[in-house]
A protein has these predicted regions:
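Tandem-repeat architecture and repeat-register "anchor" residues
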Residues: 32, 39, 71, 94, ...
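Short, solvent-exposed loop/linker segments at the N-terminal edge
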Residues: 46-56, 154-164, 270-280
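Short, surface-exposed alpha-helix to beta-strand junction/turn motifs within ectodomains of secreted
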Residues: 2, 58-83, 166-196, 282-308
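Short proline/glycine- and polar residue-rich coil/turn motifs
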Residues: 83-90, 97-100, 196-205, 212-216, ...
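Extracellular/surface recognition and adhesion modules
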Residues: 1, 6, 27, 34, ...
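Surface-exposed or flexible loop/turn and strand-edge residues in extracellular/cell-surface modules
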Residues: 24, 31, 55-59, 70, ...
């Protein structure tokens, strides 16, 4: 409030003035420090607004107890974009997370003052947040290791036939969201199970598929059994799709029975290879349509040790000296 009395040089007194013409007092005294009544933080992460990964947008909702000038806001120690809401008491600040921020709870700071220039106490803690949770940031992308694809084939677990059970196994360096572990084996969706729960270092997963005659084996030449693994960690960070084993060795599917394409049964008899006497050596040689396990061979009712020949497991030979 103010009051003005005045007199001109001749001694004439003017009417006292104590208000502005057509308005209120020009100066309003404000010595009250403003406060933040709401400081609420959330992420647009699909797995939960208290989680964040690179690319997520963090939103800080700010409400003051009186009009304030545009506040200065940092989120994750970075300058945030600030916009006014319905009035100068309501503000919003946003920041998009990058690979440069540190893992852990996302910090924030609000520096503000009211219209009179009274500085408020910088706000760094939640106030009236709906769930009371800070946002946890995780920029560590999950990675799979020890990825194996094996068959229950007792001779060679790198091969499968119709009826063979193929098992996909792998470890993760982070806890995975079960509903987001998506596995396909031989083009068929499979439900994984956890073989080892999180132990602070890793967790292990497995999925199986039983091969059938419905799968083409490329005319007996065999085909590599395909698989894919898609996965997301608890913070909603997706790992790179995996479609190969760690060793590069997978499973070959072959449902076609082998056949003998060439067979020779000869004696070293000096008169005729079709004749044999005691002491003569009879040799059996076979060539199959594909690589074989060691075949069982007998000559004249006697088991004979045979061996692969020609640098391939498709050709085998065995000999027996007649007695």
């Amino acid at each position: 409030a103010f009051n003005i009395t005045f007199t001109d040089l001749a001694g004439n007194s003017g009417a006292a003035v104590n208000s502005l013409t057509g308005g209120d007092d020009a100066v309003r005294i404000d010595k009250t420090i403003p406060t933040i009544t709401t400081a609420s933080i959330a992420s647009n992460n699909g797995s939960g607004d208290e989680l964040a990964v690179p690319g997520n947008i963090i939103t800080l909702t700010i409400v003051a107890n009186e009009d304030i000038v545009e506040p200065t806001v940092s989120i994750a120690t970075q300058s945030a974009t600030v916009s006014v809401g319905a009035d100068a008491q309501n503000w919003t600040a946003t920041y998009t997370m990058t690979e440069n921020e540190n893992n852990g709870t996302i910090p924030f700071s609000i520096t503000f003052s009211d219209s009179a220039g009274n500085d408020g106490v910088a706000q760094t803690a939640l106030v009236n947040d709906a769930d009371g949770n800070n946002v946890n940031y995780d920029k560590s992308q999950p990675v799979l290791s020890n990825v194996t694809l094996t068959s229950d084939n007792t001779f060679n677990n790198a091969y499968a036939k119709s009826g063979s059970v193929v098992t996909l196994a792998f470890d993760s360096n982070e806890q995975l969201l079960t509903s987001s572990v998506v596995i396909s084996i031989n083009g068929v969706s499979r439900t994984p199970s956890k073989a080892l729960s999180w132990n602070g270092v890793k967790e292990s997963w497995v999925a199986t598929y039983t091969m059938t005659n419905a799968t083409d084996d490329n005319g007996g030449a065999g085909i590599s059994v395909p698989f894919t693994v898609d996965y997301v960690d608890l913070n909603g960070y997706a790992g790179d799709q995996v479609d190969a084993t760690s060793s590069g060795v997978g499973v070959t599917f072959d449902k076609t029975a082998p056949s003998i394409t060439t067979l020779s049964y000869l004696s070293n008899n000096s008169n005729s290879t079709n004749m044999a006497k005691v002491g003569d050596v009879i040799t059996v040689s076979i060539e199959a349509s594909e690589d074989l396990q060691t075949p069982d061979l007998s000559i004249a009712g006697n088991d004979v040790a045979d061996e692969a020949a020609g640098g391939t497991n498709a050709i085998w030979t065995g000999s027996y000296a007649m007695q």
